[in-house]
Amino acid sequence: MPIAQAYFELRDVRPLDVQSWIPLREISEAALDSPSADVTRLETWTGIGTAAVELEHRTEAEKLGWSHGLDVDTHRAGVESWGYRSSDIFRDWQKPLGINLVVDQHIEEGNLSIWHLHPDLVVALGLYREGDRWFRPVEGWAEVVRLHHGDDGRPRLIEIRSEFLRDYLAARGMVLYCSSYHERVMVSAAKPAFSWPSDGFKAEIGRDRHEGIITDADYPDPSDQFWTRGALWRTEWVEPGKISTRVRGDDDAHTSTFVLENDGSRAAGSALDGAMSWLYFDPTLVTTLLRHRGGGLRWFSRETGALGATRHGVHFGVNRLGLITVFAKDIGRLASWEQRLWAAHNVTPDGGVSKELFAAQMEAQPAATVAPESELSSALDDLDKAFSAKHGGALLRDHETVASLLLRAHRFQAAERDGLLELSKEVTRLFIERIDVDAILAVIGAPKKGDKKPGSLKALKNLWRITAPIARRAQ
């Protein structure tokens, strides 16, 4: 099947401004599968260079482009005739216009390329790097920036989530200027039947410049074949956000709302800070919050604890219907992004406020009860210690997933579809699957020759059958 002419005219390249992830720098190439035996080579190449430009220098920046100051050449620092040139400063021939949010450092030895994310962007957004990802811990460890490498290990693309970039640009009074070059090349045995006059075309559409050409192939391709190339040069702007809630601390106009009364009356999250009432939530909220890295669930009593998508949880209680109740002003003090998580599970008040929560917050009399979830870890440890003290070896094997299993072993699992089954699986993994059968066999004796080695439950049952009478006689 022949490749369409439109493919080489590159009118399908999406503007960066509409994308969820904005490339800050890209140097990528790809060899594509041939759609037919006639096509012997099909490749693409993309280069994108960007700079954060101060708003007052927007006009000067527009004079620069792919062949004039904004491409994917490596950055350099050093002393020029006019003074010191900093690698992170984006400038024309006369003055600084902004900053390079990514600095490309070239290392001669080994022909290495290292891409550095601008430290001001990292600090301003509160990012934490793990490998090739940058996360924002205070926002539920949201992934903000990601770096991609090619098969050769060289950096190929670094991109940032649009809303975070726009927040930063708004705070700094900047706009992102982008210059790119896109190329699509085909080598084919037959000459493409395109409608281009004189085997080529040129077009300028807005800020885009398109070119196409069909000519005889040259080395290293067979000279009796045809070489087709389509190219696009583009400059474009990614505008700043209207507000900056993260960096500048602007108020979020799109705040969540919460049901306050049985009649369905609601209040905005921003209006809850001084509210003297309680909000009610479906218990499925817990699973949503704990999906976030850093999310936590701690217990203060049988029906109260702290819960949140970050380590700074809010005081909650469980009422007689199993609903989660929280003092409204505690929700009002959460960040907007976390309020949205809570709002999705907000329900009409029903069943009254948790008695233990009311006693703790309004009467300063915290309950002396204990949540079974809070005793699970210590119960397992005590059992393991008792077995070790008696028989000289651990009953339960250590496993790196124990901490996460304990976090998920809670009553709210049962509120989810198939949640009770999942809860039973978590408890099984915590105890049954960690039992060291060999440690038990060392106490009760190995199976007879020819008998199958018992599983965890069978071994535990045999241990109980042998040791229980001894324990009773010792009482």
Q: Each predicted region: which residue ranges?
A:
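Amphipathic, oligomerization/interface secondary-structure segments
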Residues: K385-Q475
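Weak global preference for isoleucine
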Residues: I3, I22, I27, I48, ...
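Charged, amphipathic alpha-helical stretches
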Residues: M1-E108, L112-I114, V123
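Intrinsically disordered, low-complexity regions
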Residues: A4-V13, V18-L24, E29, S36-L42, ...
